[in-house]
Amino acid sequence: MKSPPSDYLKFWRVIRYYMKAKHGLGQADLDIILFLYSESYFGRKDFDRFAELVSWEVNRFVRLHQEGWIETFRKGRGPRSRALYQLSFKATRVVLDIYRKLNGDEIPTSLSSNPMFLKNVSYNDKVYRNMILEMNKYQKAKRTIARTAKKDDD
């Protein structure tokens, strides 16, 4: 069996935990945002269709809309015209940041950029913090190897 060119999912759990901690999102919220990212515009039925797969929360749509993760693209006017929504700039940035981290960008380790590096954090945050440091070290080594291989080819 041929292995993929890049091992994108190796640190998926660490990246997901970091994004949830940084942006105050739950697992279900993040899953829905990732699903809706490929949908340019969506209606409430589209949202509810995917929301059936994640943990149940009555007001999830309203909450995500109020918190600025979803914005109204077009208001519904009358019985035949339904409202359309789109992911906000904030939600789009989160998804793009996830892709960048999966492609090898390092997770920041400064106190101002990463809440898991504060002093008064949970044990879980400390465990993930150590894994972030390992992941960043791995990504640096991987980039160094790629650079030296490229120099050898030239």
Regions found by a protein language model. Give the residues of each.
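Short, locally clustered residues in the helix-turn-helix/winged-helix DNA-binding domain
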Residues: L34-S38
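Short alpha-helical segments that sit at the start of domains
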Residues: K2-I32
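A short, conserved structural fragment
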Residues: H65-P79
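Short, amphipathic alpha-helical interaction segments positioned at domain boundaries
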Residues: F89-Y123
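Short, cationic-aromatic polyanion-contact patches
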Residues: A21-G26, K75-Y99
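Short acidic, hydrophobic short linear motifs in intrinsically disordered regions
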Residues: E39-A51
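Terminal interaction helix/tail motif
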Residues: S112-R143, K150
